Regions:
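Extended terminal
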Residues: 2-18, 413-415, 427, 444-575
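N-terminal type II signal-anchor transmembrane helix
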Residues: 2-61
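Flexible beta-edge/linker motif
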Residues: 53, 58-147, 159-187, 203-257, ...
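Short secondary-structure subsegments characteristic of cysteine-rich extracellular domains
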Residues: 133-136, 307-311, 374, 454-464
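Flexible, surface-exposed loop regions and adjacent strand-edge segments
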Residues: 147-155, 322-329, 444, 486-492
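Short amphipathic alpha-helical linker/capping segments at the junctions of internal repeats
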Residues: 151-163, 197, 273-275, 325-338
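Interface amphipathic segments
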Residues: 192-194, 207-246, 256-268, 367-444, ...
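Long, K/E/R/D-enriched contiguous segments that form extended
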Residues: 322-323, 328-334, 338-346, 350, ...
């Protein structure tokens, strides 16, 4: 190509580039003029119209959404919403009670701000993309009915009017600060739940149309949730309070602190009081690791790899001087798990530094006895009601200090195949028996003066109807008598004089034994696992102690007979 031709082509190229530059400059100038002479206002107005249309199209029948004020700012990519409220018509409450709806939702927020909004993308492509959404101090209200709740239910009902004006809503961050929430069960199975100081931080939040008449899909990359406090009233009138809560989908962990269950005040003058267990509970912290948020929400279940309960303190009082309540069936642990309305799986449950203090008031003595457990720790595995886990078993081991002195260790296993079969082994070692006076004196008028329980081992196997097992019991120097001050008639009915005579030094003094006995018991349907174990323990102790008492009676008879013979022989010698 000759030099003149090349110069001609270059001149043409430069003219084209220059022309394009002039066009761009002109377009930029026109855009600047347009923006300063009502263009931005037009863009703001069109964006507001589009948003109002989207809200109208997305509305679910029976729900009403109102906006106090919607202000678009195209120059700064900002959208501000004031006094927004979502409510539902009262007639929907009947639909909730009949099961037509699974739950209802209402809420309002004084101010919501969206920053980094692309207005042109919204108008041209129907994509609502923002850098951040912030809601300050909103209020949320949930109402549930008799049906099992599907959290995705409202999303399925959106977009049934056809093609959506907005196909995608995406934000880099979603922040909800200082919110409050209530959950109310219209079926009256659960009391109202109050949540205060709720904060949520989500990242890469995306809501997209799933297809014509197919609702919408929600996807979130990461979520962190914090709560200042949660409170509610339990069915028995006790107050449940939970302090700070922190849950993280990103880290798959959770923390609940300062959990408290406080019974209602006791009205000593009430004629309706019944003999029932009154429990006070406190937990320092509940720590969850491996918390599967996605499966928990998608499957309406609770999946946790490890849960730790730290600083559990339980106090239970039972006043047996009051009339007994009508018996109600009580399920053993596997059956109780199976009856839960949602799926649960906890791979490992650990109990750290727990205390249990049981008090009981006897109807005859009118006094309170106590049984304390301290420094308790335990670990249980495979706690689940998953139908696919029927070939598995719940297993666990535990240890504690009994009456502030003896050591208790044990194991537990329960089948998950519906048979309710279980096995438990418990060993108690080195208990100074005078410690049990805190229970035996006020409840039984029996006083232990000395003796050591060297070891007690109980092995028990059973199901929800009956159990059997063995008890090995070894004790040294047991000396027990009817409590001083017991009325004479009552002391006689308790064979107090016989007991005093049996344990005299001439008959051997304190009893010592090392034996093993079998036992079998039937379970009342209203008996919990703990009372089931106490029934077995009492039966095992009876079968071990009665033979020793009978042997001591025979020793008394033989000794008295020998003494009588010696005295008779001595009298004959004197004659």
């Amino acid at each position: 190509m000759s030099t003149p031709q090349r110069r001609s082509i270059l001149r043409i190229i430069w003219r084209i580039v220059g022309g394009l530059a002039l066009v761009l400059i002109a377009a930029a100038g026109w855009l600047a003029w347009w923006a300063t002479h009502g263009g931005e206002a037009w863009l703001d107005r069109k964006a507001e119209e589009r948003i109002h249309a989207v809200i109208e199209q997305a509305s679910v029948p029976g729900y009403n959404f109102t906006l106090g004020r919607l202000k678009a700012d195209a120059r700064h990519g900002r959208l501000t919403v004031s006094d927004a409220e979502l409510s539902f018509e009262p007639r929907l409450l009947d639909s909730l009670r009949t099961g037509a709806y699974q739950y209802l939702f209402a809420g309002k927020v004084a101010k919501a701000e969206l920053r980094g909004l692309s207005f042109w993308r919204l108008l041209l492509h129907g994509e609502f993309r923002v850098g951040a959404i912030e809601l300050q101090g909103p209020e949320f209200h949930y109402y549930t009915g008799p049906k099992r709740v599907d959290l995705a239910d409202p999303f399925k009902r959106l977009g049934h009017g056809g093609n959506s004006l907005v196909s995608v809503l995406f934000t880099d961050t979603l922040s909800i600060a200082d919110a409050s929430a209530t959950v109310q069960d219209l079926n009256k199975d659960l009391p109202e739940l109050k949540v205060n100081g709720l904060s949520v931080h989500g990242t890469s939040v995306r809501v997209s149309a799933a297809g014509r008449n197919a609702g919408v899909r929600l996807a979130v990359a990461g979520t962190d949730l914090r709560v200042d406090s949660i409170s509610t009233l339990l069915p028995d009138g006790s107050n449940l309070h939970i302090g700070a809560v922190a849950l993280s989908r990103t880290k798959q962990n959770g923390l609940l602190t300062a959990i408290r269950i406080t019974p209602p005040p006791t009205d000593s003058m009430s004629v309706d009081r019944m003999a029932k267990s009154v429990m006070t509970l406190a937990v320092d912290s509940l720590v969850m690791a491996g918390l599967d948020f996605d499966r928990s929400i998608a499957d309406e279940a609770l999946f946790i790899h490890r849960m730790g309960i730290h600083g559990l303190h339980v106090a239970v009082d039972l006043d047996k001087s009051l009339p007994e309540e009508p018996p109600e069936p009580v399920r053993l642990p596997p059956a109780a798990l199976a009856s839960m309305p949602f799926s649960i799986r906890v791979d490992t449950l650990a109990l750290v530094d727990a205390e249990v203090h049981y008090r009981e008031r006897d109807a005859k003595t009118g006094r309170w006895g106590e049984v304390p457990f301290s420094r308790m720790s335990a670990q249980f595995r495979n706690i689940t009601n998953d139908a696919a886990a029927t070939t598995d078993s719940i297993t666990g081991r535990f240890n504690a200090t009994f009456f502030d002195s003896a050591q208790v260790v044990g194991t537990y296993a329960a089948a998950l195949d519906g048979s309710e079969k279980f096995s438990i082994t418990t060993t108690v070692t080195r208990l100074p028996l005078v410690e049990v006076n805190r229970a035996t004196q006020p409840l039984m008028r029996m006083q232990v003066e000395k003796g050591i329980l060297n070891s007690l081992t109980m092995r028990m196997e059973g199901n929800a109807r009956r159990a059997k097992g063995t008890m090995e019991l070894a004790y040294t120097g047991l000396l027990v008598r009817v409590e001083p001050g017991t009325p004479t008639a009552l002391r006689s009915s308790m064979f107090g004089n016989v007991m005093d005579a049996m344990l005299q030094q001439q008959y051997g003094g304190g009893m010592t034994a090392d034996r093993e006995r079998n036992f079998s018991i039937e379970r009342d349907p209203d008996r919990s696992m703990l009372t089931y174990l106490w029934h077995a323990t009492r039966e095992g102790l009876t079968r071990n102690l009665v033979p020793e008492a009978k042997e001591r009676m025979r020793t008394m008879v033989r000794t008295d007979l020998d003494n009588w013979k010696k005295e008779r022989a001595a009298r004959k010698v004197k004659k």
